[in-house]
């Protein structure tokens, strides 16, 4: 790109951001922070155990979304969807191995859009999918067209895997409940190195517009972080979540298959409490890295010219419903995830929104805030109006899918979340139905799908769900072993 074209684009972005916020400003930088497998185990989201002062600080600065939902609670498809603005059914990506460009070779990703507008587009760590921990330090399943600079740190954690406690030795540490309270400093761990490199890139590019993707690997298993973060969570303060004794009695087997069909993997409660302690320690470790990024922005005087978006690829189970762990489910804990926007000058800053939003909405939102025109084909909806007025009525709906092994054969789950209801079908109901009333059952303990009193609700939600997402096993290629 010639310097003249670059100057014209930058001037155009200046005008666009001025028009949007009603005050002079230079083009916004974007600090796009991703965490891996982080559920709403954050103090500002109401978690009574979590110690997360820096994410709380970011929430106080910006707009926290309490009801943000991923498109698939699995690393590769959710990240591909979020970064392209296209739903999994459009990308034909449902597993951990298929690249979105196999189906959409000409897709323009969110960071690629910034490149087209003359920004530096940079990545440190995990934005697209990586196998964790074995692909740490590589490009993973990256998209080279998205970036003009990438950094792949590889820390001490990758050299000490032999020290990790694995509660399920028959499974790899990437999938098992496994952890290490590590010796050494934050900066020696991969995520600490990611933070250091991100700060370096912000400093080097402080005088030109940048899009910087910062992708942390934690709290994905194995839960590895410096020992000092374990000290924040005495084991006697860790509790397993409440569930009625008969919680699973009215739920289809497909709702649990592949994710703890046997509660807590059959492990002793003392062990799963240690796993939960390790997860929280990793959350606080990631929180500390976010704090380093915020401090760096302030010290560089970039806070007033940088949008910050913090998100996790999906939610995560920590023993809910009598012992579900990890992801790939369509309950609230797996489908919902943290989302915090800080935009300089946004009128909604310092508040929270209860409106239903989807991760596919991030692409058009970030583009609009920066004065960029996204591709016409993207399927999300800009939530800029909520950032300006978080208490507005949005009437959003979220659609989440999960393709995975179930009772020996692949099964597709599809779920719609409205402000009141969650309705879920497994293979369009052939493998079970679920309906939960969030007005009085936020824990999703009572399945109303087969209650005749709710037949009309089921019919209405079924029509909406089937009109938007695939509810059966797809004909497109997928790897059954990598669901």
Per-range role (PLM):
Residues 2-5, 14, 19-427, 431-433, ...:
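Formylglycine-dependent sulfatase
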């Amino acid at each position: 790109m010639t310097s003249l074209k670059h100057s014209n684009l930058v001037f155009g972005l200046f005008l666009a951001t001025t028009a949007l916020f009603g005050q002079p400003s230079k083009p916004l930088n974007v600090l796009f922070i991703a965490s891996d497998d982080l559920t709403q185990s954050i103090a500002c989201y109401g978690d009574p155990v979590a110690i997360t002062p820096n994410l709380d600080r970011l929430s106080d600065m910006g707009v926290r979304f309490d009801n943000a939902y991923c498109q698939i609670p699995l690393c590769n498809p959710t990240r591909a969807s979020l970064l392209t603005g296209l739903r999994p059914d459009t990308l034909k990506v449902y597993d951990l191995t298929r690249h979105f460009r196999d189906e959409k070779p000409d897709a323009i990703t969110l960071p690629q859009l910034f490149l087209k507008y003359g920004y530096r587009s940079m990545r440190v760590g995990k934005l697209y999918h990586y196998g964790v921990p074995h692909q740490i330090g590589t490009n993973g399943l990256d998209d080279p067209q998205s970036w003009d600079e990438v950094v792949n740190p590889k820390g001490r954690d990758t050299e000490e895997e032999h020290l990790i406690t694995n509660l399920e030795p028959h499974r790899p540490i990437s999938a098992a409940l496994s952890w290490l309270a590590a010796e050494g400093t934050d900066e020696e761990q991969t995520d600490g190195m990611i933070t250091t490199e991100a700060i370096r890139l912000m400093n080097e590019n402080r005088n030109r517009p940048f899009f910087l993707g910062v992708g942390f690997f934690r709290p994905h298993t194995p839960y590895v972080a410096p020992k000092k973060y374990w000290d924040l969570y005495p084991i006697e303060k860790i509790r397993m979540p409440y569930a009625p004794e008969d919680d699973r009695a009215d739920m289809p087997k497909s709702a649990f298959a592949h994710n703890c069909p046997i509660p807590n993997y059959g492990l002793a409660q003392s062990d799963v409490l240690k796993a939960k302690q390790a997860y929280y320690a990793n959350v606080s470790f990631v929180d500390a890295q976010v704090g380093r990024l915020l401090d760096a922005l302030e010290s560089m005087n970039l806070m007033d010219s940088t949008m910050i978006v913090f998100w996790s690829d999906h939610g995560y189970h920590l023993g809910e419903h009598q012992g579900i762990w990890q992801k790939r489910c369509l309950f609230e804990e797996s489908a919902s995830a943290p989302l915090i926007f800080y935009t300089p000058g946004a009128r909604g800053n310092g508040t929270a929104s209860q409106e239903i939003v989807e991760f596919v909405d991030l692409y058009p939102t970030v583009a609009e805030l920066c004065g960029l025109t996204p591709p016409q084909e993207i399927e999300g909806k800009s939530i800029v109006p909520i950032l300006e007025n978080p208490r507005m009525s949005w009437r959003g709906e979220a659609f989440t899918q999960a393709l995975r092994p179930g009772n020996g054969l692949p099964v597709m789950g599809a779920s719609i979340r409205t402000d009141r209801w969650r309705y879920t079908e497994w293979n369009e109901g052939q493998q079970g139905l679920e309906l939960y009333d969030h007005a009085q059952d936020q824990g999703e303990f009572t399945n109303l799908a087969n209650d005749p009193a709710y037949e009309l609700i089921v019919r209405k939600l079924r029509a909406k769900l089937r009109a938007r997402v695939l509810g059966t096993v797809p004909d497109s290629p997928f790897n059954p072993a990598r669901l």
